[in-house]
């Protein structure tokens, strides 16, 4: 019964559906509008605002199977993954929730009935914990459910403070909180461990499978616990743990999902030992990595992207340990989709981008992995203690891309720890250097808090009468402002659009008799719309009536650029694939900028196709419609939501014919034909997996095309042709240039040979070794390498040091014949010179190059060469 994890998931959701719960899809692994969380790590995350009373749903009971990641930040299981039976970076949390509906008795009954009747777990294998003073829960378990008193364990404040307990849950220092009750399963006395609350509780015999949280208090800032008017319930059960019980195994890695991934990995890498811990690591990591990419996270060097990169690189390192000689990680995605069943729907839709992203990241890391491992291995072999210094760990991170936890993982296998304090100190020094080189800007009204509300009228009008409800000057509330004052004015209603959703704020004026206030920007402050600007004439007071006039021309140009981003988004998805999602945008009167997810640069033919597709939709002159509807209806209509955005229960849906439908609160043109023309001006990468397109529309696009045409005609004139023959003429010119460069190179070689014959005679003897140190004039830097080769051949045995000085640049090269590299190494010698001329360099023992930025110090540096060589040869 329920022998697969997929069947168990379906049974859980169906059980609660038949008990009046709304089945809610798993939310993204990237929490919507919650800066406190790196990743979704519990089933209740998507319902947080419901529990806080800030969001209302059409249902009061819900159930879900939530994808979760714990890696990085406070909740970090990465170090233990693969080494224990139950630590994972990715897991699924089965849960049922009550928003002021049922409470303790029903919640306990639902859990017990599902476990003992639906799954038929033996009651004698189960015991429960409750908060020490929760007598109500004890009575329900004992009297209503029939659990013996000795199997109900009271857990008190075991974390050093009041209400700090394994059995008391709280969202934060203040807010909803309450006692919880946990259900434990006894795996049997053949496994070491004791019941909860005993000294042996950390063993693996008794495993928590279900946690039922009773939110019944609202914790105040002073610590007082006030009862909630409508108590709620939040529960969670890890699917991997209950699957292990149902499948008769002890370790989560023995369940069907992990076994399929372990066997597939072993088959790809030719591994026969299926108990190898590296196989466990890889099987776990493919789940978190694949689903994170499917949810829009791309490998990068910051934030969520860096956590993803760390997990991928850890998996790749374990693959390398198992003998992987080529990319393998991405090949596990089809197996993952197969074993995850219904939970893999989103992954299936993004399979291509997931596989390509994993493969690209693996190939990138493979270039430095072997060298980094070699350096780490050498450092570990030289250790006289059991601690690797932080400087070495930092070098591996900074130069070879080794996350510190990957270094720690390698060290752990040799029972060595990493000096993480030393690593952090080295990181801090790097940050200081970066900050010293950077500049930081401050927002004009950073931290401004406004309680007032404004109604936006700008969808249908660009001017209206309004009343001043608040004034802020220098960040403080003010009653009056006069000519010359800079301020933020809040109106009760306004046609001015406050910057949001990538659309810049409107400009314009606020006027009345004898009064003019120039609006240079409009921003949103909570529910208020703030008009930022300067008083030109008159005096403005709170409560005063003004006429708000938006600059019509600027608004119209902004609308052209905003509307076309919707067409661009749809066109990119059509040309590049459904994995494309918007990652950011900026639309103002001058241009538009659109950031989107894609694993490689957009090819020229693809850009051309996108541009043509957008212009086709412009010519079709679709009418734009904007409707307000509930979010579920919008999703059913296929409206695209922006990744990571949080939406109200009612949303505004903007539709452009049959081509584009998106959730959007911005302002737009009436018909796509109003846009006139769309022209892409640039495309490039801004982060790993994130591309950026910049473009112009309307008159700006026409001006851009006209400028390109003028440049084409100017090029034609220079090439003595017309615009139709430019390509052919340019190709012929390039071929001619290539031939001339080839001839020039041959002449330089001849010159170098001739020069070397003369220079070789200038060599001096140092302890029986011929040494040539020469500052060259009129020699191209590109000829240095060939020249030092010629000189070494002429000398047969000797050392050559050549230098060229420019206005603000120095080029150095050192050559050492191979019979002398045991005593003098070119890399060391060139480095000793380079440091004196403001540079650095290196290379092989027989040839090394360097550069510098202080030509004024070159003569003095060259004077030190002979003494340096003398010391080495003596």
From Swiss-Prot:
Known catalytic reactions: tRNA(Ala) + L-alanine + ATP = L-alanyl-tRNA(Ala) + AMP + diphosphate
EC number: 6.1.1.7
Annotated residues for binding of Zn(2+): 562, 566, 664, 668
Gene, per the UniProt record: alaS
UniProt name for this protein: Alanine--tRNA ligase
InterPro entries named in the record: aa-tRNA-synth_II/BPL/LPL, Ala-tRNA-lgiase_IIc, Ala-tRNA-ligase_IIc_anticod-bd, Ala-tRNA-synth_IIc_core, Ala-tRNA-synth_IIc_N, Ala-tRNA_ligase, Ala_tRNA_ligase_euk/bac, DHHA1_dom
Signal sequence bounds: none
rRNA-binding keyword on record: no
